[in-house]
Amino acid sequence: METVGEIKTARAIAIILPKLAHAAVAVAGVTAGFTAAVSVVTVLEGLWARGRLLAAGYTTESVSTVDDFGSHYDGDRLELTLLGDSLAVGVGAGSPEATVGFLLAEGLSRTARRPVRLRNVAVVGSQSSELVEQLRALEDSEVRPAVAVIIVGGNDVMHLQGIPTAAKYLAHAVRQLRRRGAHVVVATCPDMGTVRPFFQPLRFFAHWLSRLLATTQTIVVLRNGGRAVSLADTVGPIFRQAPRLMFSTDSLHPSALGYARAAEVLLPSVCAAAGYHRDGGGNVPHRIYRKGGRYPLAWFAFRASREAGTEITPAHDRHGRPAFLSGRPAFLNGLSLPNRQHA
């Protein structure tokens, strides 16, 4: 037999539940309305940005290039391949020599003291889903790169591409490249919230969507055997402090200085992927993430996505089990530092 208290509780629930249902519907409606509004604004911003690119003389066609570096060095040639979007192409750099591809190939050649062939199959305006076509172009060339660098994510944010979908295509690309014997370095999505032409609240929305995508990219890259390097700093504090210097004239892409900063962050990881360390230094100490430890993988990846030039790579524990993930500031490669670890 029910007590008076139980009856009152049941009645209260009967009264509250419909109100909660109505409130949920109202919240869902507001959320849907906000999402729709952001979607419309984002699409308009994307069309506007595309118009600026076309007006500046950029196209959405492939600009596949092949260049050789360090021909005066002896030894077998290293194959370096770039895939991705306009950042991989070098839109806004002003000259081929200032693009991230040229800077990485030149730096790798000097570090390895071997000739390097750079093959760039990136396409301006590409989203993660279009990596499939770039992989096909690479397969048609029958090239097996030693190191492949992927720079993608900004257009996924601009076009509100679903994060799971973007991650699926990136994971596929990393798997395919690994099967071809390449070591893969992925520059995770930059913070699109720092692009000045975007207005609030779109800038705030782009900021958090960029972080979520970068976190997801880090996880899927690790799970498929690649290296993930945060490029948040390429449009981070230094871009806020000196936008006229770090952004190109279109205010959307990095300038030559901006690309130089990106290459500075990426180069140590590219060299390490090829089996070389810069400046003759030893191994850099790793911050360790332990599976089942205090923080989940998603938290660790999110923290990495917020730190300038942080590289995350798969690692193993002292028993050889793949239970760890290790990260290090990419720009610290080659420096002799005390050997310390953080759980």
List where the protein language model places each region.
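Conserved catalytic region of serine esterases and O-acyltransferases that act on ester linkages
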Residues: 2-52, 261-343
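N-terminal signal-anchor transmembrane helix
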Residues: 48-79
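Conserved SGNH/GDSL esterase-like catalytic core that processes O-acyl groups on lipids
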Residues: 79-81, 89-168, 305, 309-342
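Short acidic, glycine/proline-rich loop/turn micro-motifs
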Residues: 91, 160, 196-200, 242-246
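Alpha-helix N-cap and loop-to-helix initiation/capping positions
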Residues: 96, 161-165, 169, 201-212, ...
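A short helix->loop->beta-strand "cap" motif at the edges of active sites that frequently abuts
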Residues: 180-182
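Substrate-gating cap/lid alpha-helix
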Residues: 194-230
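Accessory beta->alpha helical hairpin/"wing" motif in late/C-terminal subdomains of nucleic-acid enzymes
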Residues: 255-259
